Amino acid sequence: HLTQPTLSRQLMQLEEELGVTLFRRSRHRIILTEDGMLLRRRAEEIVSLAEKTKDDFRHTQDHLSGTIAVGSGELQSSRFLTQLIAAFQRDNPLVSFRIYSGNSDNIKERIERGLLDIGLLQEPVDISKYNFIRTPIHEHWGVLVSAESELAAKSNVTPADLAGIPLILPDRENVQNELLNWFGPYAEKLHITATGNLLYNLAFLARDSQSCVVTLNLACHYDGLLFVPLSPKLESGTVLVWKKTQTFSSAASAFIAYSKEYISGML
């Protein structure tokens, strides 16, 4: 245990060493500055990476064990991923998984930092740095609209239907470009009110602001909202990726090999 004076002295020494102010101090409390919050995030990543490293070396003589860190977006393909994990764990019950949810850019960033072993990414996405397996699952695009909207009565919606209507789009640039291509000449008439990376909060915003979310069909129910497919149909593929240059734990290497066999059996 450290006494308060000792801790305060060490914090001041850390500020001097880094050449930045980490805390705003008052008589009764201290508050992290932006530099302080950055240092905290980096420290959390270091701790997470240290824990992952210990997990990588955890094994028994006779049985595969350890923890595999996997990232996935909000995708229909996530169901395929959970089935893959469950099948692998039936053969390797001592292996556990740590699941991280985010969009493709978030997941790639964490793979680059060594915090994730494998990621399930939505295309289009740059995978030049990665080995990959393309899954047989296709993601289908549409809009989440208010159940009271005129669009909710349609079997599908066209670019003309969405021109001028308040829209919420995914915030990934590659995906936005794909959607703008789908809108064609109507792209100039779009009224984009918000962007975001995960659907849960965007669905609430759509319901409260009478906007439409352009999204993948996740087969999820949101009160007061209905999913309507796009026409012409728009689909996205998904890929399971891992770094080309990374040395993996025995558990992660076995899971990658298992994934290749599992997916080849689905094709």
Question: Where in this protein do the model-derived segments appear?
Answer:
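A short LG(V/I)-centered, amphipathic sequence patch enriched
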Residues: E15-L32
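Alpha-helical linker/hinge and terminal dimerization helices associated
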Residues: E17-L18, L39-Q61
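Central regulatory/effector-binding core of bacterial HTH transcription factors
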Residues: S65-D126, T195-L198
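Beta-alpha-beta core module
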Residues: S128-R134, H138-H140, N197-T247
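A late-sequence structural motif
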Residues: F80, V228-L267
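Flexible hinge/capping segments at coil-to-helix
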Residues: Q61, Y130-W141, V145-L167, S250-S253
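Helix-turn-helix DNA-binding motif, specifically the short coil turn and the N-cap/start of the second
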Residues: L2-T6, Q10
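Secondary-structure junction motif
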Residues: Q122, I165-A187, F248-I256, M266
